[in-house]
Amino acid sequence: MIPLVLEESGGSERVFDIYSRLLRERIIFLGEQVTSETANRIVAQLLFLEAEDPDKDIYMYINSPGGSVYDGLGIFDTMQHVKPDIHTVCVGLAASMGAFLLAAGTKGKRSSLRHSRIMIHQPLGGARGQASDIRIQADEILFLKERLNTELSERTGKDYETIKEDTDRDFYMSPSEAVEYGLIDLVLDKKPVKV
């Protein structure tokens, strides 16, 4: 069930689902597995927020176990395409494609809450069919692995061979370890108080 928020304005009341209300504050929430439906929604939100104000930052909160590489790359490419800076924040878990999208935020604006976990690994896939079909699928997975590792290398400052070795198996990090690794820039302990 999606929570609803009641907002009073000018003597009238409006009801929003919580995600629509957050979007009005330029906040996108990825709180599920990355699928085509998730990707379409997030891409649309990014494009909408850019059209609304191309000079105002966007905030993306991520609590995701990962998901489809193709759909995640669609989100990633859109994040790089839109003009606004994108703050990414891990809340809970950013694993696999979730971690990749966390690292895709604007450098200097990638963060995590302190008890979150972050995990990178190589793409997963299965193959069936005739030997030639299995070979085609294996080549595609190797291509995707190379693309993801190249992007992670560029975003973290780690050399490609280190990324390749670290993503060979599940590689878990605490937020402070993710800062050291270059996946994020900051561990958020407390929300700053505005005076």
Curated annotation (Swiss-Prot):
UniProt KW Signal keyword: no
Active site: 96, 121
Catalytic activity: Hydrolysis of proteins to small peptides in the presence of ATP and magnesium. alpha-casein is the usual test substrate. In the absence of ATP, only oligopeptides shorter than five residues are hydrolyzed (such as succinyl-Leu-Tyr-|-NHMec, and Leu-Tyr-Leu-|-Tyr-Trp, in which cleavage of the -Tyr-|-Leu- and -Tyr-|-Trp bonds also occurs)
Main location: cytoplasm
Gene Ontology molecular functions: ATP-dependent peptidase activity; ATPase binding; serine-type endopeptidase activity
Subcellular localization(s) per the UniProt record: Cytoplasm
Biological process, per Gene Ontology: protein quality control for misfolded or incompletely synthesized proteins
Function: Cleaves peptides in various proteins in a process that requires ATP hydrolysis. Has a chymotrypsin-like activity. Plays a major role in the degradation of misfolded proteins.
Name of the molecule in the record: ATP-dependent Clp protease proteolytic subunit 1
Taxonomic path: Bacteria, Bacillati, Cyanobacteriota, Cyanophyceae, Synechococcales
